[in-house]
């Protein structure tokens, strides 16, 4: 069934989160909470997306407003779900047919469930179709009241429910599929004569029944899908469920997770088959990992492109880096933004790079800082080497040609260029360009004072 649009209600502040950030922008598995029902609606086939924002609407606009398929409606005063929907209808001018109404704080909702909801809506011919769930502890949710034949008659909110109604275990999810024509013509009939003095969208169910327009229902297979996130405990639970879903899909696609419960992978991360990921790894953002890679314990990767057969050894941290095939990084290495490692590069323990291009086969095996540098192929960077790229005001570039050998404890004071196949002696501070095929040595000559230590001891 075609879905004309989806309305996502996201105007609430989320007081129980006890946060300066509006609830729906809290992150789960690499996306803001609101991004999850939005993605589900799109995958289910919704055309236009309308977000109803209220608290921190400017932040919601900043995060989602640049998307051409999303419109933002403003609910300046929060007077209930019915009022929220009424604030959004002018964004749907010119549309007809079915519309999904979702909650911005239900990140576990899936596209498959929305498709079931839309299919039932089309098959039943009802004006309103509601997604429900059966809960062992339904406190706080609106209850689904059915007649003796099992037909939905109305939804009663917790604060307005009688003791008998509170005993009902089938609850309203706050998620609906409605006919736009019915919604437009009846939203103005909602009243606020209830315990919360709000305009309940749920009252449209009773109106639809009373006018014989029809109300249908779909029971969610997994009650977790309708869970609203209202505090940090529920946020952690939802994040755990999403992480399990992400990890399950990766394992089914041929990725080995040694301990899935201790592996944290954002939803938009891509990982190739035959890659092995050890516990404690965190993969974030728009990261892409190739096939046949190994990520040892406690590796963190954010917004990186990693090619095939790369070894990321324990404790390494990579951010906004590009790593070609057959590269080895770590252990305990740090690739900062702008690091580009070409094929067969080796970055060893306690090596830090930033804004560096390292050519094919080059190595920096130990205890090195490389920043603002262009390094050719088959270069050896000795232990303790530093590119001195910052003069206190500006950054400067170091260029090292192909085949250069840099000895241990070398400082390259930028801007400086080292020509191809040159050799920099250990302990040298390079302050001038080095011609190709040359030896550069700049250190005080060694002086041995024979017997000096004996004299020092004898003199006390």
UniProtKB/Swiss-Prot annotation:
* Enzyme kind, highest EC tier: transferase
The residues responsible for catalysis, as annotated, are 366 (proton acceptor)
Its localization reads: Cytoplasm
Reactions it catalyzes: alpha-D-glucosamine 1-phosphate + acetyl-CoA = N-acetyl-alpha-D-glucosamine 1-phosphate + CoA + H(+); N-acetyl-alpha-D-glucosamine 1-phosphate + UTP + H(+) = UDP-N-acetyl-alpha-D-glucosamine + diphosphate
Please list where the region (N-acetyltransferase) is annotated: 254-460
Where along this sequence does the record place binding of UDP-N-acetyl-alpha-D-glucosamine? 9-12, 23, 75, 80-81, 142, 157, 172, 230, 336, 354, 369, 380
* UniProt function note: Catalyzes the last two sequential reactions in the de novo biosynthetic pathway for UDP-N-acetylglucosamine (UDP-GlcNAc). The C-terminal domain catalyzes the transfer of acetyl group from acetyl coenzyme A to glucosamine-1-phosphate (GlcN-1-P) to produce N-acetylglucosamine-1-phosphate (GlcNAc-1-P), which is converted into UDP-GlcNAc by the transfer of uridine 5-monophosphate (from uridine 5-triphosphate), a reaction catalyzed by the N-terminal domain.
The protein's name: Bifunctional protein GlmU
Protein's organism: Trichlorobacter lovleyi (strain ATCC BAA-1151 / DSM 17278 / SZ) (Geobacter lovleyi)
The opening ranks of the lineage are: Bacteria, Pseudomonadati, Thermodesulfobacteriota, Desulfuromonadia, Geobacterales
Q: Which gene encodes it?
A: glmU
